[in-house]
Amino acid sequence: MTDNDVTGNDVAGLQRRLAEFAAARDWQPYHTPKNLAAALSVEASELLEIFQWLTPEQAERVMDDSGSAHRVADEVADVLAYLLQFCTVLGIDPLAALAAKIDRNEVRFPVRKRGGEAGEEGKGEAEREGEGEA
């Protein structure tokens, strides 16, 4: 058993803590799939806002500054909190869903290298058609 398991910081433990937090405040009526999806989008936008006008080089160094590092970590936590609550409400196992998606993408987008770089031949059919997604 890891320290995370003991403190409830594994995924299931965090989902329980979030559910208990909402229940203690009578927030469950507001935690509908639509509302949680909207809140997730808002929080993801707040994460993006931190990086909006940064150059790629500045973005790579964002965690070097304690103030911006704290903001990024807080927004990541907000995104994860709403995603976990969304999964709880809909009965989705987030780790199983991610593993299944990675499996599908490995089939959809096989590795094909040409000259050490993934060129047009290295892209899956859907990606060439503009349908590629993570």
Name each model feature, range by range.
Residues 1-134:
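Flexible "arm" and connector segments at domain edges
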